[in-house]
Amino acid sequence: MGISKKSQLVPLLAFITMFLMVVSRVSSSIADANSLHFSFSQFSQNPKDLILQGDATTDSDGNLQLTRVSSDGSPQGSSVGRALFYAPVHIWEKSAVVASFDATFTFLIKSPDRDPADGITFFIANTDTSIPSGSGGRLLGLFPDANIIKNSTNLDFNAAYNADTIVAVELDSYPNTDIGDPSYPHIGIDIKSIRSKSTARWNMQTGKVGTAHISYNSVAKRLSAVVSYSGTSSTTVSYDVDLNNVLPEWVRVGLSATTGLYKETNTILSWSFTSKLKTNQLQDLRIASVV
């Protein structure tokens, strides 16, 4: 007795359906594993999901104070502080494009000085990053002091290199022309160096809440930043860079700030971040086929 074509198609269709379900499930789980999102509308006084370094603290008003302030909220000089999200970010993978990401934070800078200093950064660094020695003031808590690197006979060169493996967007309130700063407050993009690759004049407004938005387009390989205050025009800066060639595969994201002889409050009111590493579809199919 012959077997109908319809009866032959049933098991084939069932197999195809099951295969597509496996592919979909595997692809979805990989995408989830390579995504990260967090959002702080305020900061608790004992944040378990932040790594606080140096003088960084959270206060009773739900703010993140990156640099030291007195009991009455006045800024203190010679202070360095950083805050990093506890979970690492998968920024690139051999079988994938580099992750795209968006970060936004709101901030408040206040100063009794005519010239506030020194600034705030959003940065990406090694997962084990710590505040480098001598990185206060103009170095924004990110890079070791050049004199320490050149002159120390006890230098751990691997540690020095790792400390420099940083990508950052700086909101630089005090121009240090001796390290390549323009002669005015500016927004800059730093690639493994405190000497910014690209800058734009920043009309900084003390005592007003500002918003910084940083994004990376992994297709265009463009890092961009927009800083604005309500009711004013924004400052925009961008630079083309392949993060695959600059950063390790796994990183942490953070905020840093410093003060020096001159001082300012470096208060963070909110902070959010989203990253997405899109895997190669053919790689997903190969993984699914062996499940």
Curated annotation (Swiss-Prot):
Ca(2+) binds at D118, D172, Y174, N176, D181, K208. A carbohydrate binds at R138, Y174, S228. Residues 1-28 form the signal peptide. Keywords: Calcium, Hemagglutinin, Lectin, Manganese, Mannose-binding, Metal-binding, Signal, Toxin. GO terms for molecular function: D-mannose binding; metal ion binding; toxin activity. Mn(2+) binds at E170, D172, D181, H186. The record marks N147, I148, N162, A163, N280, Q281 as: Cleavage. Hemagglutinating activity is stable after incubation at 70 degrees Celsius for 1 hour but lost at higher temperatures. The keyword Ribosomal protein does not apply. Pfam families: Lectin_legB. The keyword Kinase does not apply. Residues 147-162, 281-291 form a propeptide. Optimum pH for hemagglutinating activity is 8. Activity drops with more acidic and basic pH and is lost at pH 5 and pH 8, respectively. InterPro entries: ConA-like_dom_sf, L-lectin, Lectin_LegA_CS, Lectin_legB_Mn/Ca_BS, Legume_lectin_dom, Leguminous_Lectin. The mature chain consists of residues 163-280 followed by residues 29-147. Concanavalin A-like lectins of the Diocleinae subtribe undergo proteolytic processing referred to as circular permutation. The propeptide is split into an N-terminal and a C-terminal part, the gamma and beta chain, respectively. These are then religated in beta-gamma order to form the mature alpha chain. The beta and gamma chains can often be detected in cell extracts. D-mannose-binding lectin that also binds alpha-methyl-D-mannoside with even higher affinity. Has hemagglutinating activity against rabbit erythrocytes. Shows toxicity against the brine shrimp A.nauplii. Induces reversible paw edema and hypernociceptivity in rats. Belongs to the leguminous lectin family. Binds one manganese (or another transition metal) ion and one calcium ion. The metal ions are essential for the saccharide-binding and cell-agglutinating activities. This is Lectin. It comes from Dioclea lasiophylla.
